[in-house]
Design a protein with these regions (language model features):
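Short, surface-exposed recognition loops or helix-turn segments adjacent to catalytic cores
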Residues: 167-176, 195, 273-277
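Internal, well-ordered alpha/beta segment that forms a basic, Gly-enriched binding/recognition surface
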Residues: 148, 160, 167-170, 182-204
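Acidic, His- and aromatic-enriched active-site or binding-groove loops in soluble protein domains
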Residues: 74-80, 187-208, 268, 294
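Short, conserved phosphate-binding/catalytic loop or strand-edge motifs used
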Residues: 131-136, 172-180
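Positively charged, Gly/Ser-enriched RNA/tRNA-binding surfaces
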Residues: 32-43, 58-59, 93-105, 113-165, ...
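Short, glycine/charge-rich beta-strand/loop segments that flank catalytic centers
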Residues: 54-62, 111-122, 169-178
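Short low-complexity, flexible loop/linker segments enriched in glycine and/or proline
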Residues: 66-70, 184-186, 288
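TRNA-binding/sensing appendages of the translation machinery
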Residues: 5-94, 150, 171
Length: 387
């Protein structure tokens, strides 16, 4: 009998734990998260973005390798009763692209969406990363202009600042710069993607070995390896343009210079830096790409960029640009920076006895009608006469 209770106790202790990579959020932490989400959403909506909600799971093809999203091994896959392979969304952008193609196929004016929800990535436990995170983001579909690029970056900056973060930097790049050098070097798409993985993973030995294997000439090899060194203030753009001879890469720098001028018009240039070696793991990005960094967390708290070919996959030919803010990482950074999050709702406690319950209930109802949060609690010896 004793052994039965011991086994039951072990089982009970196991049941209260969550799987690796997910966690409970409650109390003050959840209250702060709610406030920050509201502040981010408030600023994004102020730019004319309208809420959209897409399913938590989609057909596998929405996130397949051909789309250029998360690798298959990192997807949470399961089957429905008809045998269809379904996936918990690892990324919002393909879902938004699918939705836009379905409901706004004939729209020729820019469409602005914003959204909030959780994404799921089946990463290794050894990486120590959350497998379920909350993201808030926005997508601007149907506008391929420099102004659209700048709007996304400026809106990101203003949203982070509005939420209470002041010490951060948005690093901006352009994939076309790297692609131009790859094309000049004669690299095929598969080799280019492999090289991108090496460079974005800071594996420069692997990158050099790959270029040696593919017999890239010395000049192109030096240019490709130098990409990771081209980062800094707007002054780096002139140096980056001098470093290349192909028009595709030069045009990429021209685009960045124009975007920077518009960001100066917004007055947010002090938060902006440039990185020509920024290469995303998402293959659907086509041009301008940006990430947001702050101290207190190792990963980027913002990820965004242009994906002008993605909607074509779903039948709609339209340029697009978007970003996501990883809310969990933002909150972790704000906590470590000791940023005070104001606006957390307070709660009023009203205690009652059997004799005065009706009176206390009336008081609670009046306070609730005035917008207060009220707990109605039985009075005990421990809480005494407090109301």
């Amino acid at each position: 009998m004793q052994e039965y209770f011991r086994i039951e106790d072990i089982m009970s202790r196991k049941l209260v734990h969550t799987p690796e990579g997910v966690r409970d959020i409650y109390g003050d932490e959840k209250a702060k998260k709610t406030v920050v989400e509201h502040l981010l959403h408030e600023k994004i909506k102020g730019y004319g973005y309208r809420d959209i909600q897409t399913p938590t799971f989609e057909f596998f093809d929405v996130f397949s390798k051909e789309v250029g999203t998360t690798p298959s091994k990192e997807l949470y896959k399961f089957f429905d009763k008809e045998g269809n392979t379904l996936v918990l969304r690892p990324d919002f952008t393909p879902s938004i692209a699918r939705c836009a193609a379905k409901y706004f196929m004939e729209e020729n004016v820019p469409i602005r969406f914003c959204y909030q929800g959780n994404t799921f990535t089946n990463t290794s436990d050894l990486q120590g990363k959350l497998k379920e995170v909350t993201q808030m983001g926005a997508e601007l579909i149907g506008d391929g202009s420099v102004q659209a690029d700048a709007e996304m970056i400026a809106m990101t900056i203003e949203a982070l600042y509005h939420a209470g973060l002041s010490d951060f930097q948005i690093s901006v790049g352009n994939l076309e710069y790297f692609k131009g050098i790859c094309a000049e070097a004669g690299l095929d798409e598969e080799t280019e993607l492999e090289l991108r993985e090496y460079i974005s993973g800071k594996n420069y030995f692997g990158a050099e070995e790959l270029l040696d294997r593919t017999h890239v000439n010395r000049k192109d090899k030096e240019q490709l390896l130098k990409v990771s060194e081209l980062f800094g203030t707007s002054a780096i753009l002139a140096e980056a343009k001098k470093a290349v001879s192909n028009n595709r890469s030069k045009n990429a720098i021209d685009r960045l210079e124009k975007v920077y001028q518009v960001l100066c018009d917004y007055g947010v240039e002090k938060y902006v830096s440039f990185d020509l070696g920024m290469l995303s793991k998402y293959n659907y990005y086509t041009g301008i790409i940006f990430k947001g960094y702050t101290y207190g967390v190792g990963d980027a708290i913002v990820k965004g960029g242009r994906y002008d070919n993605l909607l074509r996959r779903f039948g709609k030919n339209a340029p697009a640009i978007g970003f996501v803010i990883v809310v969990d990482d933002l909150l972790a950074a704000m906590s470590r920076q000791e940023v005070v999050i104001s606006g957390i709702e307070s709660y009023v406690k009203i205690y009652y006895t059997s004799e005065d319950f009706k009176e206390m209930l009336q008081e609670a109802r009046q306070l609730r009608a005035a917008g207060k949060n009220v707990e109605l609690l039985p009075r005990s010896r421990e809480n005494g006469e407090v109301k």
